[in-house]
Amino acid sequence: MKINPVKWLQTLAVFAFLTCLTGGILEAKIKIHSIKSPDGKLELQAVTQANISFCLLRGDQVLVSSAPLSLTLEDGTILGPNARISKARTTNVREVIPSPLYRKSEITAVYNQLDISFREGFGIRFRLYDQGAAYQFYTTGRDSLHIVNESAGFLFEKDYTCYVPYSRGEANPFHNSFENVYTVTPVSGFELGRLAFLPLLVCLDDGIKMVLTESDLESYPGMFLKGEKTSRGYEYRGVFAPIPSTTRTEPVRGQVIPTGYSQVIARTTGTRSFPWRIMAVSEKDTELPVNDLVYALGAPNRTGSTDWIKPGKVAWDWWNNWGITGVDFPVGINTETYKYYIDFAAANGIEYVVLDEGWSPPAGQDIMQVIPQIDLQELVTYAGKKNVSLILWCVAYVLDEKLEEACSFYSQMGFRGFKVDFMDRDDQPVVEMLYRLAETAARHRLLIDFHGMYKPTGFNRTYPNVVNFEGIFGLEQSKWSQEDMVPYDVIFPYIRMLAGPVDYTQGGMRNATRQDFHPVYNNPMAAGTRARQVATYVVFDNPLVMLCDNPTTYMKEQETTSFITRIPVAWDETRILQGELGK
């Protein structure tokens, strides 16, 4: 889109806010502040008049502009409209960020920042990197805030093609596992009544791509998007899960499910910063999987030393349904079976074994209970002698019930972490719970793998012991879904992986063409070639990565197994030599 000053002045008169400006005579009340990216290619113009808005440009092309920015409080106060500027200042920053267990050992973040504070007790920070832009609200001078809405809208003049991950929670889109393939659709084709979770990709003109996502999500709900054509253009509007007013506890796993919602999206301290809204920009598709804005905008490390946090591969039980063969003991969730997994891990240099769902009786919903078929202390001792570490699966809400007790007990026993599952929400109470889990686990030197989880939001910078995240349509789907995962697997690295690592759970050894593939729960197969499964260990970011198939199968294919186990899981640097979205 080329900028026409007259057109934009007319837009200003009609909508009482300026989306973008390159020239013309304006009223004195309109204030325009601009910053450029360090390489000079991007420019962000922030406009304050009756409302606060911004636009992001690349040369004379408007990439995106905003709807009016505001926070609406429960008492009716709206922070944004008619705000009076107290101070506006720009800074140039270069910082080196250690990034353990990430796709590179450190990040050099270079950006220009515009910080506008207002007399009404709030402000907005805008940051512009070579790789994109971000903004966040902050508030001051209040004891507490009850927020009922945040106005966050991303406006495009054209009906661009987008890669949309719809929430699959059709009855309640706020309750979902953040797993879906991408629907390729123009903004105007967004399905009515649905919401999309982040990240979401927009294909702009001239091969430019933009990924919308967020970072530093703490004590606040995650953002969903709703696409529609409005009088302002083609818009993705932010939607936020309210705080649940009523819940029910699912009887089998103890998962807490909302049954009603309040009008408030966040009850929080009055002096704080809010999540960064990110617009990551690429000229080449290969720039997207190594865009570091989400990590760089996360809150700094709160764990101190990270030397004790070890990445590695995992021999996993659940996907293959404990399906080992040729043994002289009953196969199942028992001590003998897990010793077999430990022996396999030790023989192949695999660092971890996960004890997935079933080691603790589900009916009790008590993480301190263990089924009689398993002796945990015996397994920890056995694994330790073979230089293998053990990780326990659990439901997040069940762990939270006895968090301090469980972390202390299992850490002292010798376990190295938890695979935490079935959150399936990103409202404020769940986000706060996950920070609580991560902090407590870190104090007891336990790593965390968040399954059933929303996308990474810089969490792994703040708590590096959180080493992996699901929020991905991973290989477990092949147990029950007919979806074609082969195209998906060459799309999501450019979108979801921009946000951070993926607990994809790869390594299926029974491989089938699309024609022959069909879901099998107990003895699943993987669509595509064996080489494709091996390649995922290089292409996908997985500091804690599963070998999902059973040890018996891997031992029959030792050449493939040995190749997989030699591939590193943490890197000093990541470079993408060639690639294209969807290919």
Spans of model-derived segments:
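Bacterial N-terminal signal peptides
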Residues: 11-23
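Glycan-recognition and catalytic regions of carbohydrate-active enzymes
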Residues: 549-583
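An acidic-aromatic substrate-binding cleft motif
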Residues: 265-344, 348
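Conserved, mostly hydrophobic/aromatic
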Residues: 137, 345, 421, 448, ...
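N-terminal accessory beta-strand-rich subdomains and adjacent acidic, glycine-rich linkers
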Residues: 30-296, 301
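Sec/Tat signal peptide C-region and signal peptidase I cleavage site
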Residues: 24-28
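Bacterial N-terminal signal peptides that target proteins for export
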Residues: 2-13
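Aromatic- and carboxylate-enriched substrate-binding clefts and catalytic-loop regions
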Residues: 356-525, 529
